[in-house]
Amino acid sequence: MHSEELLAQVAALPALPGVYRYFDSQGLLLYVGKARHLKRRVASYFTKNHGGTRIGHMVCKIARLETTVVRSEAEALLLENNLIKTQNPRFNILFRDDKSYPYLKITGAPASSAGRDAPGQRFPRIAYYRGAVDKQHRYFGPYPSAWAVKESIELLQKVFRLRTCEDTVFANRTRPCLLYQIKRCSGPCVNLIAPEAYAVDVQHAQALLSGQTQELLQAMEARMMAYSGQLAFEQAAEVRNQMQALSRVLHQQSIESAHDKDVDILAVRVQGGRACVNLAMVRGGRHLGDRPYFPTHLEDAALFEQETRDAEEAPATPPRPVEALVLEAFVAQHYMVVAPPPVLVTSTPLDKALLEALSGHLTAAQGGDHAPAAQGGDPPPAASSGGHPLRGTVHITAVHQPREQRRAWLEMAQKNADLQLARLLAQEGSQQARTRALAEALDLPLADLDPLTIECFDISHTAGEATQASCVVFHHHKMQSSEYRRYKIDGITGGDDYAAMRQVLTRRYGKLAEAAHEAGGVDCAARPAAPAQGQARLPDLVLIDGGKGQVGVAREVFTALGLDLTRIVGVEKGEGRKVGLEELVFADGREKASLGKDSAALMLVAQIRDEAHRFAITGMRAARARVRTGGGQLQEIAGVGPKKRARLLQRFGGVRGVASASVEDLITVDGISRALAEEIYRALR
């Protein structure tokens, strides 16, 4: 039953558009929804009999309600998806994307290059880039993959021979590198090309990236004829060779368009309770490839939408297909942080209200001097392949039934969506089979394997230096990278893996065991029931990368903490340390077990063990590098983060070089102001 206070709050809601949020008794966000009539929509949850459905299960958990009144349904739509993206409610469709988009960067501004003193600044370079932007550079993209960026860089190298080397390398060369020998660079490092001629090549490269291919070819032809008229036949031949190279590249592009410069193609497929949105990108008339997205919480959100929409829709209104819900969620969440191109080609019709709301939101957001920063470290969104942030009025159109080239693009995107979804379903089926095989081998409960949680620990160091412990987490049939943890091991003898394992297990489970004991007679040696969402719990299985000795240490820690010893399993390397011959070592006295080389259970154990090893060794290497280069000393200075530290170390070759640099030298590094340079100078001296 819901509290009288909550029901009174529902009864007092206004008949206005807005967004509502449901929370459980633990304060966890369950669901975010929009409504054109808040009172009618929210009341429907509490007046309908949902029975034993998943919606009924969720409604029973509602303990608190929050609402936000907005001016229109369009505003409610945008606010809803912004909250979904940032707060990850349990029952909404969510598109997670841990990877930021890559961009192609051209350093400096061509118009001002002649007035710069530094050689590297007079000859801009092209580079692959992710991260925050610097206004003095130009960014082209976004690209769907690193491969697409690198392919574009190779194209520019073939046609315009622009440099790709770092400024520090460029400034210290005395003879041209191999790229010059294979005609991929014009040799600006040793003045084999004039800054003015190089600037023209940069401008031509920008025109190509912006999709102005025909205009570019015409300009190059006019330039060639001008050289010929001046009897400068060598220069005319160089321009002719550039035109031939560009024509070959354009001819080799199997997919190109003279009309559509910037288009996104969105194909949606739903099958087996999962969905895939395949996003293909066309920038500058070139098809750059595609990128699949897989939403979470699909079934719950679809049921919610279908059952609760009746509160606001006419009875004769047909239900919207799941594909439409998925596409709407993707467009609202994705293009809030990555600016859309002018045209979207979609496999499912898009709601015009969504496009109008999104266009209005982006127009308002881009009205100032600075574009909003995208999430995940992306540069400010670019309106086109030309690299300029959106300015002025933004207008987005969607085409549902395209023709000609657009139709071919959509058919290809749909085929790729089918392939990606089939791959995902096969992969998930295989992973679930592995989870079941391991549960059967270790006599774990088989009723519900989704919440089965496994944590694995590994220790890594270099001859006792920079010791790091890793903990990786597996549940719901996949690795949960957001729950990984690294532990810096201190206060032990260098190289003592047993002491390191004792320390990390105590730190990981000590507070949890203490809290369980204080909860009032909770038996830590028994397997707990599944906890409420977000509540900390002991894993069902603790894997230790090690044999009898490491497992003995884990047994001592768990005994001291009053925890269940049957959870501990060591992964001991087999004879000759050969893969597939590993044996499982148990802390509760059971005999060693060999699962068999081709066992699905062993494949899962090896997968988790290898991930723990990878996570530990990457952390150890980073810690070791900080110790050896003194980077940690730099990072202790207020205002110097990892990126600025890396730039300083790269420019001056190490902390000693930074310490010996003057303030004037320090301010030449990107991102280092005079005030920060003075602070660094004082701190290192």
From Swiss-Prot:
Keyword Cytoplasm appears in the UniProt entry: yes
GO molecular function: DNA binding; excinuclease ABC activity
Protein name: UvrABC system protein C
Gene: uvrC
Bias kind Low complexity: ranges: 365-388
Protein origin, superkingdom: Bacteria
Family from the record: Belongs to the UvrC family.
Gene Ontology CC annotation, any one: cytoplasm
HAMAP family: UvrC
Keywords in alphabetical order: Cytoplasm, DNA damage, DNA excision, DNA repair, Excision nuclease, SOS response
A biological-process GO annotation: SOS response
Keyword rRNA processing recorded: no
Task of the protein: The UvrABC repair system catalyzes the recognition and processing of DNA lesions. UvrC both incises the 5' and 3' sides of the lesion. The N-terminal half is responsible for the 3' incision and the C-terminal half is responsible for the 5' incision.
Spans annotated as Disordered: 365-391
Gene3D superfamilies reported in the protein's UniProt record: 5' to 3' exonuclease, C-terminal subdomain (1.10.150.20), GIY-YIG endonuclease (3.40.1440.10), UVR domain (4.10.860.10), UvrC, RNAse H endonuclease domain (3.30.420.340)
Residue ranges of every copy of the GIY-YIG domain listed in the record: 15-93
